[in-house]
């Protein structure tokens, strides 16, 4: 909506996002206790369900509001293109751990991912990958960058050192 005089509210279980005329992205998954709103252009505000005031935290384009239950609202500058890459059917990760990446991969491909070695979770990647590639092709990228291997058994993927 580009009508600033008639904002609308996007409600989540963690808080409300007031939209004042804008292009924005909301990321909220039931298996995570965090909601994120990224502003592309226009204006949005956020108010947690736990807030004792009527005030909304407002952000400018290029910023993201993150809120985790019981914590403070966090505002940070982000690369908007990374946050809305899914519009272009891409995964876009910048300095993300393999654990963070595999959460998104598991959700998208509807698979369960386990790590054979806890140290592998912290491996860091910056990459852009096609969401519609076969999962084997996507995982091959990670195998080529680090000395890791993916064992696929049906809907279960185990990540291990080579």
Positions of predicted regions on the chain:
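A residue-level detector for the "anchor" residue at the start of short, highly conserved motifs
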Residues: 1-162
């Amino acid at each position: 909506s580009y009508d600033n005089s008639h904002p609308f509210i996007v409600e989540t279980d963690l808080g409300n996002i007031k939209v004042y005329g804008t292009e924005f992205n909301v990321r909220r998954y039931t298996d995570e206790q965090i909601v994120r709103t990224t502003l592309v252009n226009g204006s949005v505000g956020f108010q947690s369900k736990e807030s004792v005031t009527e005030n909304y935290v407002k952000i400018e384009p290029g910023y993201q509001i993150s809120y985790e239950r019981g914590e403070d609202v966090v505002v940070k500058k982000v690369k908007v293109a990374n946050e809305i890459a899914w519009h272009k059917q891409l995964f876009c990760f910048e300095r993300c751990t393999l654990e963070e990446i595999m959460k998104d991969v598991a959700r998208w491909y509807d698979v369960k991912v386990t790590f054979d070695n806890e140290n592998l979770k912290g491996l860091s990647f910056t990459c852009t990958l096609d969401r519609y590639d076969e999962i084997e092709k996507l995982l091959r990228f990670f195998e080529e960058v680090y000395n890791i291997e993916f064992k696929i058994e049906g809907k279960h993927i185990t990540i291990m050192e080579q």
